[in-house]
């Protein structure tokens, strides 16, 4: 055994030194819950929350970003996701939290041994019977499907229960993936009981899915924070007012068009959602006016277009300056 292998083994078993950064080892993007482009708190039955992670239940639940606040049992990971039943809720529907891998990232695991690991702890009023949390790796034989709507040939490759305490613990599970599986998903869920109190939740972080029979120290999927953001932007990109606007081309005094390059090539041509379009402005020919409407005008994996209507300004053929102001653009290529 080399010194590097020995050091890694000791660190893994003792929880000691910081793990080496190994880009590509972890198949799950944003496993440390550092990227939250959509916001940091959600209260709904089904939605994407932290980048790449979605919640699902038959009733509204809360998912939020929290500080891990424990440098002893959980060193070197700043954030976690809190999955919570709403205070006062009497719904006992399962609360699920999962990430779908696209087919191109699932096929490399076919026929291999995998290990699924994460850190988790319970809230003070966690209501699952015997403090149980369920952990699953789900497989399917389809292409780029979503676990909420179901996988073709769906099967649980890993399906285990674990017991939470209010202290962070690391859990790991190992199994072999069938040679015919073309999609994987990681899921945790709990089944609440009774009526929820204020701290009926569990928290999770350091989520990792890797090839091999041993849970190695946690690493970001892309190695660095910048790389992790780029990995997340393959599926969702949030263009905010802080990004400015740039130039657009006027078709008339009241109609303009803009085209933008997306910083990361997306999984597929994204759908475009615009919020608060009237918060944007256009400046042309020495004057300026408010935008009255913005709509998507085509997209590809690398570019997207906008069609803008506005008050009279400039002239056809002018290059105008566009400021998003408080308007935001969301590009979605999720599964």
PLM regions: where:
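Extracellular and organelle-lumenal recognition/adhesion modules and their flexible linkers in secreted
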Residues: 2-335
